């Protein structure tokens, strides 16, 4: 388990992290979200033992990060911001160096090297120096060093930063695979990543936790939760459709996009309006291209509570 208790970090007059407490248990993939400067990276550095807290404490698998640093770090895989490494080293030598530091030997060493090379698709760059790699490959090398010793806890700061869409998909699949028996914290500003791999999300703003829930429940706070979107075949029906939908008692507002010939009905207090809107469309003879029920928009919730 990862545990933080009243964790704070101050730099003279600036409070970067302010009284943060949470726990993460095995099987949880926690998305750590926040705007730039919110305190995400500072919190992760304190968890990883790279920054000393001003107050409070953090532990990894029961080992205090300050008083038992080696025991805590043995159980931790950490991908820092920017994926720093030794640029002059070849990729193969760097991974072997990490194996030495992690005291991996014999068959287990070979197996773990093979695992990270295969799953992060590093075979083609093993003999290149790290400084010559693209940003995406450097990120994958950084992730490889974090997981090579198969730790029970992973702390990953922007793990898909710099990756192309195919590489992002592969790394997210790997995270989902590892999530079965590990504790994983992912710091990200990519909200689609939270939907793709996380079963819990914490939002931090101005150094404090402002939300802690599942992505689905956070999205349900959105005014678009249970909203119904209709795309019409005929632009000439748009104005009448808007007026008819707006007159429904359970509809709070209607947004219109003339370019897409689309209207979105927003419910009052998250009410279920799909049936009423669908029946109205049928009774009014609206010719539809699409009828879509929204589950909420995490980006809108994020903006509303961090602004």
Regions found by a protein language model. Give the residues of each.
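ABC transporter nucleotide-binding domains
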Residues: 2-4, 9-205, 209-211
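Preference for bulky hydrophobic residues occupying beta-strand positions
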Residues: 9, 22, 230-232, 263-265, ...
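Short phosphate-engaging motifs
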Residues: 16, 193, 237, 273, ...
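ABC transporter nucleotide-binding domain
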Residues: 171-266
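A short linear hydrophobic-aromatic micro-motif
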Residues: 121, 250-255, 287-291
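Short, surface-exposed acidic/glycine-rich loop or hinge patches that mediate macromolecular interfaces
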Residues: 63-66, 209, 235, 268-271, ...
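C-terminal coupling/interaction segments
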Residues: 268-307
């Amino acid at each position: 388990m990862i545990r933080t208790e009243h964790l704070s970090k101050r730099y003279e007059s600036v409070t970067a992290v302010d009284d943060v407490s949470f726990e993460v248990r095995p099987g949880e993939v926690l998305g750590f979200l926040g705007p730039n400067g919110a305190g995400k990276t500072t919190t992760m550095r304190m968890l990883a033992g790279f920054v000393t807290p001003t107050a409070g404490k953090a532990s990894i698998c029961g080992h205090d990060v300050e008083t038992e640093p080696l025991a805590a770090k043995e159980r931790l895989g950490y991908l820092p911001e920017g994926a720093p490494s030794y640029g002059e080293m070849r990729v193969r030598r760097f991974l072997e160096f990490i194996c030495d530091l992690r005291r991996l030997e014999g068959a287990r060493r070979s197996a773990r090297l093979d695992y990270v090379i295969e799953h992060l698709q590093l075979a083609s760059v093993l003999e290149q120096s790290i400084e010559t790699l693209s940003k995406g490959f450097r990120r994958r090398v950084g992730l490889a060093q974090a997981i090579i010793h198969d730790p029970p806890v992973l702390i990953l700061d922007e793990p898909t930063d710099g990756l192309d869409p195919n590489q992002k998909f592969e790394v997210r699949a790997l995270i989902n695979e590892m999530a079965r028996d590990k504790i994983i914290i992912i710091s990200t500003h990519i909200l689609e990543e939270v939907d793709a791999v996380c079963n819990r999300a914490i939002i931090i703003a101005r150094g404090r936790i402002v939300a802690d829930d599942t992505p689905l429940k956070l999205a349900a706070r959105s005014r678009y939760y249970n909203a119904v979107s209709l795309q019409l075949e005929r632009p000439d029906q748009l104005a009448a459709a808007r007026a008819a939908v707006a007159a429904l008692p359970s509809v709070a507002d209607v947004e219109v996009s003339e370019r897409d010939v689309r209207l979105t009905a927003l419910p009052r207090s998250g009410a279920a309006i799909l049936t009423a809107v669908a029946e109205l469309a049928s009774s009014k003879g609206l010719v539809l291209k699409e009828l879509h029920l929204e589950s909420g928009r995490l980006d809108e919730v994020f903006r509303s509570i961090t602004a």
